Structures are given as structure tokens and as C-alpha cells.
Amino acid sequence: MSAEKTIELNGKSYPMLADGEYDVIILGTGLKECMLAGLLSKKGMKVMVLDRNGYYGGECASLNLEELYKRFKGEMPEEKIQKKLGSSRDYCVDLIPKFLMSCGKLSDILYITGVTNYLEFQCIEGSYVFSGKSKQVAKMPTTVEEAMNTPLLSFMQKLKYKNFLTGINKMDIPGEDGVDSDEDVPLNRMTTRELYKKYGLDDNSQDFTGHAMALHLNDDYLDEPATETVKAIKLYGYSVNAYGQSPFIYP
């Protein structure tokens, strides 16, 4: 039986991992590191990924209660508090939000790089928004039936919104739908505010369209060309159709 191969580091001997020879060593197990490892391994390289933490994910990690306390407090709380909080494994706290649009570019990149071979995704059961008009939380509709019953829209707005979405689906997007990326389409010469006005959408309809569907962070987009907003709304629709409950998936 051959002796175990070791490597010397700072005066100590450590057993070699695999055969001890790698083309690339990547430090960290965050999203970008995993994507890089996947791309390099697809090229036939031997890749070793190391992480100084006791958990995977880097800045994108999901931590149990013990890991969370050690990261932000340095140590666990006293025993009586631990008992009150329950089992550490019952907690899974994301360090950053991880919702992905199911048909978005990041989802495509994860698939191409092979990261999806090591991750499982599940569809979020629903998306909810707070309506300033009705002062209540409501589910974003994903079916015709839900759209007709949602409190987010008045009856007249539901009819106008149906026409709006029908119109959106027929609009040409540069670089998509068989349209050249540099082609000058009508959307480039129209602001989003003008687009909303064309279909008669009120402020409430504009709010949840721009922020809950197109995911704009503020209202600056209203006076910008409507192309990017229409593209985002279409992506939202494609992503909902992919799974039927919500446009978002979660690893």
C-alpha cells in the first residue's frame, strides 16, 4: 500500500486533495466563483474551489441561526435565548435577495455555465404588492381569472389594462422578435408616460406595472423611451408563463 501523498505548508503536513494537481484554484464559493468554475471545467480544466468559511455561497450564502450569529456577533447567544429561538437548522437566512426571473439572462447564464447541475430551483408561489389606493396587500394576477378579480384595478381599468397587455405583445423590440438591434422602432420615440396615456392607465395601474412588473426602483423611467419598460413587461409575462404561479424562481 503506497504512502499517502502530503503537502507541506507553514511547517505542517496536509494530505493532498485528489492528485494534488490543478489547472486553476478559485478562492470563494459565491455565485461568480461557481460560474467561473463551471466555465473552466467545461473547457476541460481541473478546477479546485476553496472557501475560508464553514459554509458555501460567499456573500450569496444562506445561513442557519448559528452561522448567522457567528458572522455578525462572533458567538452564539446564551443558552436560554437559543432555546427560545429553537433549532439552528430551522433557520435559513439569505444574506442577499436571490429571486431570479425564470426567463431572465441570469437564469440563462446559470444554465449555460452548468451551475444548475448543482442547484435546485423552485417557483415562488406568488408575488404581492401593496396598493396605495386600496391600502391593502394584493397578489399580482397571473391568470385571466385572477386579473378579473384583483383589487388592484377598477373594472374600467381592467378593460383598459387588457388592451394594454395585448398591445404590448404586438410591439417590436430592437434586438428581439426578429427586429434588428439598431432599427428605429416607434417605442424609441415614445416615453413610457406617453405609452401609459395612450392606453388610458391611471396612476395606480402605472405604479404596479412600472414597479411590480418592470421592477423600476423609481419614477424616472416614465420620461425615458418606453423600449426598456416594454421589454421588462414582456420578460415578466414570459417568466409567468414558464411556471404559471410567479415569474420568480428561488435557488
Where are these regions (language model features)?
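Glycine-rich Rossmann-fold phosphate-binding loop(s) that bind the pyrophosphate
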Residues: G28-G30
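Rossmann-like flavin
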Residues: D94-P97, K105-Y250
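N-terminal Rossmann-fold NAD(P) dinucleotide-binding loop
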Residues: E33
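Conserved N-terminal glycine-rich FAD pyrophosphate-binding loop of Rossmann-like flavoproteins
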Residues: R52-I96
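Extreme N-terminal leader/targeting segments of oxidoreductases
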Residues: M1-V24, K42-K46, L63-K73, P77-E78
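Gly/Ala-rich phosphate-binding loop of Rossmann-like dinucleotide-binding domains
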Residues: A37, S41
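Eukaryote-biased feature marking scaffold/signaling PDZ-domain proteins and nuclear chromatin regulators
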Residues: D19-Y22, G86-D90, M101, T116, ...
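Short hydrophobic alpha-helical runs that function as membrane-insertion/retention elements
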Residues: V47-L50, L119
